[in-house]
Amino acid sequence: MATLRKVVKGLVVVVAGVIFSLGARAGDDAPLSKEQIKHFLQTAEIIKSKQSSKGVTHPWRLTLSDGTLTHDASFQPVDEHKAEMKLESGKVELGFVDSYKYNIAAYRLAELVGFDDMMPVYVERKWQGKTGSLSWWLPVKMDDAERVQKKIEPPDPDKWNRQMFRIRVFDELVYDSDPNLTNVLIGEDWTVWRVDFSRAFRRNKELRAPKDLVKCDRQLLERLKALNAGELAEKTKNYLTKDEINGVMARRDKIVATFQAMIAQKGEKEVLY
């Protein structure tokens, strides 16, 4: 499987905003806020289900309804822990974890650093006796694997690249051991989302692919600098261990140091946007 860092022009993202306009509308036809989406995902009745053939964990596509709104969601109950695991790449990982908890942790971390505009809302929910992550189903036309296979170029390369840089930074922060192009979803208007972090949050304190850090969004860098271990621990309680949080903070330090060194060498205009 091609990885994110093998794509030259890369990955992608969305514009920030408090309102999550994903085709979802309230009864008065106003777009739903993220808090309204969270409430819907946690409380709406599940009326239909179908298992996906995509991905390693084969998540479920559930249809939810609260009597006014009907919308789909992705349910991922995987919570696998192994002392040793041979990955698809052929590498062997010790202390392997593949867990829905990391999806929720990634979203909560994203909220802290201003990256949640690039992800669907994730909550925890129980269904058919299993607890898992439930995320808002996104209106997409293809994933990035399909885009690469069909050799489709983005209509706005500069915007694409700027958003690519943001995803690369976040991927280094969470240390996803399985970043692949099927986890990048592209909407009709080329809005893009990064999904599925079930193999993230490794305890490594080194960066996974430091060469991927080329440029950085100014606001994202400032939010990274302000990230606090205590706040992160509180926000991800029951989802991340102390060692996993320490890994995030150590990688944060290295990300910030990397960009500060680049700014000192090249100048701010060449590094930040």
Where in this protein do the model-derived segments appear?
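Bacterial N-terminal signal peptides
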Residues: G10-S21
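Non-catalytic, low-structured ubiquitin/UBL-interacting segments
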Residues: L4, S21-A24
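Phosphate/dinucleotide-binding and metal-coordinating scaffold of catalytic cores
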Residues: G23-Y273
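Bacterial N-terminal signal peptides that target proteins for export
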Residues: M1-V12
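Helix-centric, low-specificity signal for extended rod-like, repetitive segments
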Residues: A2, V18, E244-I245
